[in-house]
Design a protein with these regions (language model features):
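Positively charged n-region of N-terminal signal peptides that target proteins for export
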Residues: 1-4
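C-terminal motif of bacterial Sec signal peptides marking the signal peptidase cleavage site
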Residues: 13-16
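Bacterial signal peptide processing site
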Residues: 18-21
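Post-signal peptide N-terminal segment of mature Sec-exported envelope proteins
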Residues: 25-48, 55
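Alpha-helical transmembrane segments of multipass membrane proteins
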Residues: 51-55, 81-82, 142
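A glycine-rich, hydrophobic loop/mini-helix early in the fold
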Residues: 62-88
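Mid-length scaffold segments of soluble, non-membrane domains
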Residues: 74, 87-152
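A structured, mid-to-C-terminal "fold-capping" secondary-structure block
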Residues: 135-252
Length: 252
């Protein structure tokens, strides 16, 4: 798989970054679909995901949720390692390797960020950022079922990152139904924990917005553009939490 990814980047890297390929003009063609899908996701969140996340928040405290968040953040380090390598950031690749080893062992499977105390700060990046570096255009804004706000490049990047994750390899290498249930259960915990952590933020965005769809779209696009920009400048230390996107994420 990685050979295919490297080959794709090598070919696409020959292109030039044309501003005319931003896909902005195509957004309006998808507007009706996007709004309908946004409403579907909103109702799904309102009637299922948010109540579960609220119940979860009521039986946990901030310390516990931070340990869960830190555990899953640590599982993203191999993804950062691969993408930093693909971007030619050798130093950052080494830091990601070091962080994963240190935090998985001394940090109790990543529940504590011991590496940061040793000066090994997180060098977060994604395959989305890797494609951006090789001049692959973002494409139009689109809302996907359950996943939420996205773009074609973001979706490809998100999928590629998922394939690099230890969680994926745990699923693909397991023949046991019990093990699969454990992996799927922990994955569900990841997203419920993320939703609980972002509860106040999303409620505030909704209550202060005249048009929640437009506000969510604007927040998503601005956050990802800033994240991609900061990744290209190697300025990870200044990156705030961009796991705000309504799918996942993954928090810092």
């Amino acid at each position: 798989m990685y050979k295919k990814i490297l080959l794709s980047i090598a070919v696409l890297g020959l292109c030039s970054c044309a501003s005319s390929s931003s896909g902005v003009g195509e957004d309006s063609k998808l507007e009706a679909y996007n709004k309908a899908m946004f409403e579907f996701n909103y109702q799904l969140d309102k009637k299922l995901i948010k109540p579960v996340a609220t119940g979860y928040a009521n039986i946990t405290n901030k310390f516990m949720r931070n340990r869960v968040k830190s555990f899953f953040n640590n599982l993203e380090e191999p993804t950062y390692m691969v993408n930093n390598l693909l971007q030619g950031e050798i130093k950052n690749t080494g830091i990601s390797v070091g962080r994963f080893v240190v935090n998985t062992t001394l940090g109790l499977f990543g529940m504590f960020d011991v590496a940061a105390g040793w000066g090994l700060e997180k060098k977060k990046t994604t395959f989305d950022a890797t494609m951006a570096k090789y001049c692959i255009p973002d494409g139009p804004f689109v809302v996907l079922p359950v996943v939420g706000p996205s773009t074609p490049r973001h979706l490809v990047g998100w999928t590629a990152d998922a394939y690099m994750s230890p969680i994926y390899w745990s699923l693909s290498n397991s023949d046991s139904q019990k093990e699969n249930l454990i992996v799927w259960g922990t994955t569900g915990l990841k997203y419920i924990n993320l939703r609980a952590e972002n509860m106040a933020l999303l409620d505030s965005l909704e209550s202060s917005s005249v048009d929640f769809y437009e506000a969510s779209k604007s927040a998503f696009m601005q956050n990802r553009k800033k994240f991609i920009s900061l990744c290209s400048k190697n300025d990870e230390e200044d990156i705030p939490n961009y796991d705000f996107d309504f799918e996942e994420d993954y928090e810092d």
